[in-house]
Amino acid sequence: VAKCSTSECGHACQQAGCRNSGCRYGSCICVGC
């Protein structure tokens, strides 16, 4: 399971063209894709 951190999620979401909406259960929540 990937470690959940705001910076990691923000980068992952940005790479996918999305915005970070936080994280839950170790997974990034991306919105606006």
From Swiss-Prot:
Contains 4 disulfide bonds. It comes from the Eukaryota. GO terms for cellular component: extracellular region. One of its GO terms (biological process) is negative regulation of voltage-gated potassium channel activity. Disulfide bonds join 4-23, 9-28, 13-30, 18-33. GO terms for molecular function: potassium channel regulator activity; toxin activity. It is found in: Secreted. Its main location: secreted. Keywords: Disulfide bond, Ion channel impairing toxin, Potassium channel impairing toxin, Secreted, Toxin, Voltage-gated potassium channel impairing toxin. Has the structural arrangement of an alpha-helix connected to antiparallel beta-sheets by disulfide bonds (CS-alpha/beta). Negative results: does not inhibit voltage-gated potassium channels Shab, Kv1.2/KCNA1 and Kv1.4/KCNA4. Reversibly blocks voltage-gated potassium channels Kv1.2/KCNA2, Kv1.3/KCNA3 and, weakly, Shaker B. Belongs to the short scorpion toxin superfamily. Potassium channel inhibitor family. Alpha-KTx 24 subfamily. This is Potassium channel toxin alpha-KTx 24.1. It comes from Pandinus imperator (Emperor scorpion).
